[in-house]
Amino acid sequence: MKVTTEQLPKRIVALEIEPDAATIEKELNKAAQRIASKVAIPGFRKGKAPRFIVENYYGKAAILEEATDEIINVAFRAALEQENIKPVAQASLEKLEPEPFRFRILVPVEPEVILPDYKAITVDLTEEPVTDATLEVALDQAREKHVVLSAPEGEPEAAEGDQLTATVQTLVDGVPLHKLDEEDDDDDDDDDDDDDDDDDDDDDDDDDDDDDDDDDDDDDDDDDDDDDDDDDEGEPTTLIMEERRIVPELYAGLKGIKAGETREISAHLPADHPDARVADKDVVFKVTVSEIQNRQLPAWEELPGLEEFEGDLDAYKADLMERLVKNSGDHHRRNVLNQYLEEVVAATSFDVPDALIAERAHELLHEQVESLARYGINMEQYLQIVGKTHDEAVQELLPRGEESLKSSLVVRKIVEAEGLSVDESEINAEIERILNDFPDAQRGPARRRLEKELRPQVAGSLLDKKLQDRLVELATGNAAA
């Protein structure tokens, strides 16, 4: 067998393979036997006609066609072994010549990843401090979970602490925000249409008389539509009558409002408002209240019990502060890891087969759909919702797939470069630590699972922890030389 190799970009190895005569003859004989077993040839039982008889009936070309796939498979496997090539994705046949029998096949191989001097890369992120103000916010949030709503008697007026259900329309210079969006879209469309106006003018002249009659009929309908748009105040929303929760002018303007009442309240929104359409602008809020409810918050002393905490309020506050500090530290650690990996990936040299990127994008799509399974959404339904075919959905995820793959490759390279590993004693110790959290009656079955089918996951978790610890050391410049 003759094999020549050629290294192509994106880690593709092209193999030119010419199988030896013995391989071809062997597969031709098998192909003739398969054909003979499928058809009736006079004078022979099925599968018993010799090859030359089958050739006489069906021709050499039919036998070669039947044998081609197996010749390629056998020769390809032999060539991979001979050249010590390990595919990482499906190979593709590029060219096939029957006389003499030879073919060219493209094989994706292991990506090439050249790390930068990753030990010289550091990130400088300041951890947000957990203050008494942070604790106060968390306490308020915990207390809010247990608020009790009640309908007041009579015709109540909105007062401090009440909860309002209302529709709110925001107007800028008398124009609702949704109208501003439509005008922006229309401006864009007008720009696109300008180039076509000259071409359409002649046709429009011919149609003007007919259109005038139609337009007259539609005028009344259009007026009705405009009125509906102006009255469209959006979906009901919840407003809490506390000055720190809503715009001060809105808070003041809603005092004393009753259910069923509509008020227009002027306000000036700050320059740092998250919605650029209203930032540093005078606006009018058109508010229609549909319901007013009293809010009864639990007494502070009741909060520990409501949160199923064993201890008094001071102990609960101390525990909450401890959790806030831990969460803040974990969040900071994740940010450090993410930024460090982003910078290392950006400085790394990659040569990656497209097939691996597509494979990762395919995995991301299926992970995305699996996360929706609890809502009863399967792949077919998901694709209908997004209006895409499976291939289109994968194509859309290629950039994320490439980013995810490169990050994984960098992590794997760093694990190798740092010599990170876990031994059996570490795995056993981790299993014992996990078992301590189980009741005595459940430890036996849990141990069997952990020591057998879950052992690889325990090892992977330990290695991941070591890796994260090392990456944080590297990222913060605290790694030992």
From Swiss-Prot:
GO molecular function: peptidyl-prolyl cis-trans isomerase activity; protein folding chaperone; ribosome binding
GO biological process annotation, one example: 'de novo' cotranslational protein folding
The EC number(s) this enzyme carries: 5.2.1.8
Reaction catalysed by this enzyme: [protein]-peptidylproline (omega=180) = [protein]-peptidylproline (omega=0)
All residue ranges annotated as the PPIase FKBP-type domain in the record: 161-298
Major location (coarse): cytoplasm
Enzyme class label: isomerase
A GO CC annotation given for this chain: cytoplasm
Swiss-Prot/TrEMBL domain comment: Consists of 3 domains; the N-terminus binds the ribosome, the middle domain has PPIase activity, while the C-terminus has intrinsic chaperone activity on its own.
PANTHER family, sorted: TRIGGER FACTOR CHAPERONE AND PEPTIDYL-PROLYL CIS/TRANS ISOMERASE, TRIGGER FACTOR-LIKE PROTEIN TIG, CHLOROPLASTIC
UniProt-listed HAMAP family: Trigger_factor_Tig (MF_00303)
Family the UniProt entry places it in: Belongs to the FKBP-type PPIase family. Tig subfamily.
Function of the molecule: Involved in protein export. Acts as a chaperone by maintaining the newly synthesized protein in an open conformation. Functions as a peptidyl-prolyl cis-trans isomerase.
Protein name: Trigger factor
